[in-house]
């Protein structure tokens, strides 16, 4: 690999080890017992008197104490054997790494190169390569078996309450089954309603599925900029994001060392990695959109395909004829990729090369099974611009491109807005399903108001929960730094947790069979004052415990039947437990009735006597009533 690097640069340091009171477990599917599908088991206290709780896990080997993490070597490349077993691929030398791939960075500022090099694979003509092609042929791949086991959380049969949960939810036409089988996964992919983003060169990947009939997924964006960040920080942010629940990660780097940063991330990522190739292509022509060419973009696509990127955001729906539709907008074109292509189209007065070369783009991506994430380059960047003609014209074009990509054998999902007030969100979901043949929808929020810079993880979390309920398959997180700056690792965690809440709330509302298990387990822990279980069952045990410890830090407080909100005398749950305990001491049901009835009658008689004593008037002097009440206390 002819990459210049600075030998003084340090290797990335990442967070490892299990989450509190958790352990990594692995499920083995009946149809492929050699597979090890990761889950996280939350270990409950003995006082719980119930089994430990398995939950979906995105953290990869980083939370498995039995695995030695070597970021310099990367994660185990388990999927290569699956790909070779299917056949239809070839190993080849691949393109040389060029100085412009890393922004022509000088040796003094070059990041340390990832040393381990593996020759890339590509599909052979006339052979099935993509998960879509295998699914249409009726073939269930190991990736399909893997994700079915993962969605079921290792269960071998449906939950007893699965049918009731489905009936209780409102799925808006989604067809969530009581139990996920590999055949169901295959059929959803064959219909284009779900994708497994899994480049054949991302051998470190733990496969996952995106589709509205599966668990709602979330994406975390990372990436450097020309102003700040480094390879070390971005690898750390990737590992940090998946620790807290990011299902996929997008590397949106726009600064130096783009190729090297991406290589480090991919070789150490167990989750799908997405990119926006136009960003790197723009860096290769010194940031001037007018100088972009199809040849340069094509070379960038192949470069990233060979590295193992799992999905590309491609803004092929930004057409010359739509650009004028944005002229009356409050915030114009806010997508970076959309604005780049709009400027190119206007400068050359030509149709976008992403649109005119779309067939060829499909052919390239198919050879590596890279999924499309058809970008919404004309998404609204303000509430005022939501659902306008520019936005929906592009969406209609994305529907046309989806069908072309499907015909070519490529997997597709569709990107969505943006900034949309609550009452305009559902029409976005409905129109996307109609125009794009139910291809998975992947939205940025949407943000439901524009008035809260610094809190846009909340403004967008509201919209994300809603559109997830309506059928959006994956939600792209927004951090508190949105519109303000590049997020650091704390912002990444806040964004991920916010969007895990939104995704889970959507799954509950849809009636997903397993969604409520964790809620119920936490509610039981809360009612029984099992504080440690309550912390550990939450999405962020560390923060929950730290908030509790701010006022009740002693270990004895972890078994106390109250918290600092209400104290021991006013805790509603403690009072309810006292009532239950009292009722339990009265074994004879008739005695309970007599006792309660007698208590009520005595109280009524006492108040009647008091009323007469004070003169029998409807309206009494307030001070006299207060004085009289003292005698009753």
Swiss-Prot record:
Binding site for Zn(2+): 419, 483
Residues the record lists as binding [4Fe-4S] cluster: 563, 566, 571
Cofactor(s) needed: [4Fe-4S] cluster
Binding site for substrate: 221, 250, 279, 315, 335-337, 376-379, 415, 442
Gene Ontology CC terms, in alphabetical order: cytosol
Region (Disordered): 1-22
Catalytic activity entry: 5-amino-1-(5-phospho-beta-D-ribosyl)imidazole + S-adenosyl-L-methionine = 4-amino-2-methyl-5-(phosphooxymethyl)pyrimidine + CO + 5'-deoxyadenosine + formate + L-methionine + 3 H(+)
GO biological process terms, semicolon-separated: thiamine biosynthetic process; thiamine diphosphate biosynthetic process
Enzyme class per UniProt: lyase
Any single Pfam family the record assigns to this protein: ThiC_Rad_SAM
The protein's annotated pathway: Cofactor biosynthesis; thiamine diphosphate biosynthesis
Key words of the record: 4Fe-4S, Iron, Iron-sulfur, Lyase, Metal-binding, S-adenosyl-L-methionine, Thiamine biosynthesis, Zinc
Function, in words: Catalyzes the synthesis of the hydroxymethylpyrimidine phosphate (HMP-P) moiety of thiamine from aminoimidazole ribotide (AIR) in a radical S-adenosyl-L-methionine (SAM)-dependent reaction.
Subunit composition and interactions: Homodimer.
NCBIfam families the UniProt entry points to: PRK09284.1, PRK13352.1, thiC
Family: Belongs to the ThiC family.
Protein name from the UniProt record: Phosphomethylpyrimidine synthase
Organism of origin: Bradyrhizobium sp. (strain BTAi1 / ATCC BAA-1182)
């Amino acid at each position: 690999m002819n990459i210049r690097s600075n030998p003084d640069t340090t290797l990335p340091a990442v967070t490892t080890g299990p989450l509190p009171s958790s352990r990594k477990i692995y499920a083995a599917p009946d149809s492929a017992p050699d597979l090890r599908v990761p889950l996280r088991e939350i270990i409950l206290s003995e006082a719980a008197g119930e089994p430990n709780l398995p939950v979906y896990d995105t953290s990869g080997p980083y939370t498995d104490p039995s695995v030695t993490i070597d970021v310099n070597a990367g994660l185990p490349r388990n999927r290569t054997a699956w790909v070779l077993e299917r056949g239809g691929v070839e190993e080849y030398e691949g393109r040389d790494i060029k100085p412009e791939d890393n922004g022509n960075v000088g040796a003094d500022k070059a990041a340390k190169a990832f040393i381990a090099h593996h020759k890339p694979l590509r599909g052979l003509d006339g052979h099935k390569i993509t998960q879509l092609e295998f699914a249409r042929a009726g073939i269930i791949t190991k990736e399909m078996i893997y994700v079915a086991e993962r969605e079921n959380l290792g269960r071998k049969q449906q939950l007893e309450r699965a049918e009731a949960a489905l009936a209780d939810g409102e799925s808006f036409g989604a067809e969530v089954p009581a139990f996920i089988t590999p055949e169901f996964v295959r059929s959803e992919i064959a219909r284009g309603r779900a994708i497994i983003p899994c480049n054949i060169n991302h051998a470190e990947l733990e496969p996952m599925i995106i589709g509205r009939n599966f668990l709602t997924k979330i994406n975390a964006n990372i990436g450097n900029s020309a102003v700040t960040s480094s390879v070390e920080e971005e690898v750390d942010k990737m590992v940090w994001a998946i620790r807290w629940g990011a299902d996929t990660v997008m590397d949106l780097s726009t600064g130096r060392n783009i190729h090297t940063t991406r290589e480090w991330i991919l070789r150490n990522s167990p989750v799908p990695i997405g990119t926006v190739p136009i960003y790197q292509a723009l860096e290769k022509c010194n940031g001037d959109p007018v100088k972009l060419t199809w040849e340069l973009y094509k070379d960038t696509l192949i470069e990233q395909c060979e590295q193992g990127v799992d999905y590309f955001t491609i803004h092929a729906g930004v057409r010359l004829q739509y650009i004028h539709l944005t002229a009356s907008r409050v915030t114009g074109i806010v997508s970076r990729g959309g604005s780049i292509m709009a400027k190119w189209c206007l400068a050359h007065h030509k149709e976008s090369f992403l649109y005119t070369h779309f067939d060829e783009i499909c052919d390239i991506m198919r050879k590596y099974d890279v999924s499309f994430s058809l970008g919404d380059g004309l998404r609204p960047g303000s509430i005022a611009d939501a659902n306008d003609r520019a936005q929906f014209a592009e969406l209609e074009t994305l529907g046309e491109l989806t069908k072309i990509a499907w015909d070519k054998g490529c997997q597709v999902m569709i990107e969505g807005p943006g900034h949309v007030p609550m009452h305009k969100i559902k029409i976005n979901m409905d129109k996307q399903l109609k125009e794009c043949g139910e291809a998975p929808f992947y939205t940025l929020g949407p943000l439901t108001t524009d008035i809260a810079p610094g809190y846009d993880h909340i403004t967008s979390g509201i919209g994300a929960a809603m559109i997830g309920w309506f059928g959006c398959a994956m939600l792209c997180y927004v951090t508190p730094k949105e519109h303000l700056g590049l997020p650091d690792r704390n912002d990444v965690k806040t964004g991920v947790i916010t969007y895990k809440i939104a995704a889970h709330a959507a799954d509950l509302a849809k009636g997903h069979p397993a969604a409520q298990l964790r809620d119920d387990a936490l509610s039981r822990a809360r009612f029984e004052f099992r504080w440690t279980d309550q912390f550990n069952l939450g999405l962020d045990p560390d923060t929950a415990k730290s908030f509790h410890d701010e006022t009740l830090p002693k270990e004895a407080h972890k078994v106390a039947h109250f918290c600092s909100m209400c104290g021991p005398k006013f805790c509603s749950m403690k009072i309810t437990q006292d009532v239950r305990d009292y009722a339990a001491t009265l074994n004879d049901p008739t005695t309970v009735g007599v006792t309660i009835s007698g208590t009520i009658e005595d109280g009524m008689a006492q108040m009647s006597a008091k009323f007469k004593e004070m003169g029998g008037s409807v309206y009494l002097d307030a001070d006299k009533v207060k004085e009289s009440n003292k005698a009753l206390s």
